Amino acid sequence: MNAPVGARGTEFAVVVERGKIQEFAAAMQSTDPAYRGPAAVVPPTFLASSALWAPEGARVDVGFDRKRLLHGEQEYVFHGPPPRAGQVLTACDRIEDRYEKPGKRGGTMRFAVVVTEYRAEDGTLVAEGRSTLIETAPRAGGAG
């Protein structure tokens, strides 16, 4: 199924846990004190891990063949200070754009831009993650 531009996933909670922030910072080999302590802030790419917390079926389905799926680009925009430990955000995906381009080895590559909005408990938009997904062209002869 190819969900249209504007299609949305189901909202899910993102609990910003201090320990998870510290684990993420350690994985980045960061010693920045902003990522430690009770009021730790999230590193800029921390929200990527929220995809792992989404319940099954909550993420918007762009309908691409996972055997030919590439993650082309990722961008984060913060609308104010970064989230802090103890916050509970509500996340929801939406398809912002779809387009096609000819593949360099033939066939057509399909693209989908998915924006994940992260909102504070009062509904304020805190951050957005913008991801460009690419479905490569099928190989000649129909093999994935």
Predicted segments — roles?
Residues 73, 78-144:
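HotDog/MaoC-like acyl-thioester-processing domains
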